[in-house]
Regions:
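Nucleotide-state-sensitive switch-loop elements of NTP-binding domains
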Residues: 2-11, 16-135
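Residues in and immediately flanking transmembrane alpha helices
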Residues: 58, 111, 140, 168-169
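Short hydrophobic alpha-helical segments of the AMP-binding
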Residues: 112, 146, 172
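Well-ordered beta-strand positions
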Residues: 121, 150-151
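Flexible active-site lid/hinge loop adjacent to a nucleotide/diphosphate
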Residues: 136-148
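Canonical P-loop GTPase G-domain recognition
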Residues: 143, 151-201
Length: 201
């Protein structure tokens, strides 16, 4: 592997489906590259416990928890040391940070690229079925999460009709003109091409 693992930041509001997409991506990369491909996962929650850690660990992946704060603000000083420790102890090919829903990915990216010395990609996941509610309530943060993204996943397309999905795609494209947009649904797995787009390979 490269001396410097790639870091993938998963951005998106609570309930957008970050953990589900994470597991699909991790399983795809393991199947593609073999069991020697090492993936380290950082789970960030503002609460004192993460409901997703057990699910990820049961799937066979190493999980580091950063709890009781957000890694873009109150825990930002702990992020680079955590990445450095994972790199030294696990020698991963990929580090995935599943950020809390209210995190601003640009802050994390800047911190890791400046002090953690590894390349960073940002995947922002949006819930097509709740798009209008999120836009009304959290438009500034949503815009920041989308503008920073290298790739965008419009998720839960099974809960939205074609018109809604088209509306989301158009709005997303206004906020980020260049990032690839992929679609995900609970009733069908993401394609290998879409998962490769997320991973940047």
């Amino acid at each position: 592997m490269s001396d410097k693992p790639t870091m993938l930041i998963l951005s998106g509001f609570l309930g957008s489906g970050k953990t589900t997409v994470l597991l699909q991506l991790a399983n795809h990369l393991r199947a593609k590259h073999g069991e020697d491909y090492r993936i380290a996962i950082i789970e960030n929650e503002v609460g004192s416990a993460s409901v997703d850690t057990g699910v990820i660990a049961e799937a066979g992946y190493s999980v580091t928890e950063m709890l009781a704060g957000c890694v873009c603000c109150t825990l930002i000083g702990q992020l680079v040391p955590a990445v450095q420790k994972l790199t030294e102890e696990l020698d991963p090919d990929l580090i995935v940070l599943e950020a809390t829903g209210m995190a601003t990915p640009s802050t994390m990216r800047d911190n890791i690229e400046r002090y953690g010395d590894c390349p960073v990609r940002v995947l922002t996941i949006v819930d097509a079925s709740r798009w209008q509610r999120i836009v009304r309530a959290l438009s500034v943060l949503l815009t920041e999460q989308l503008e920073c993204a290298d790739v965008i996943c419009v998720n839960k397309c099974d809960l939205a009709d074609d018109a809604q999905i088209g509306e989301v795609d158009a709005a997303v494209r206004e906020m980020n003109a260049s990032a690839p947009i992929v679609h995900a649904s609970a009733i069908s797995p993401m394609s290998a091409a879409d998962l490769d787009a997320i991973a940047g390979v």
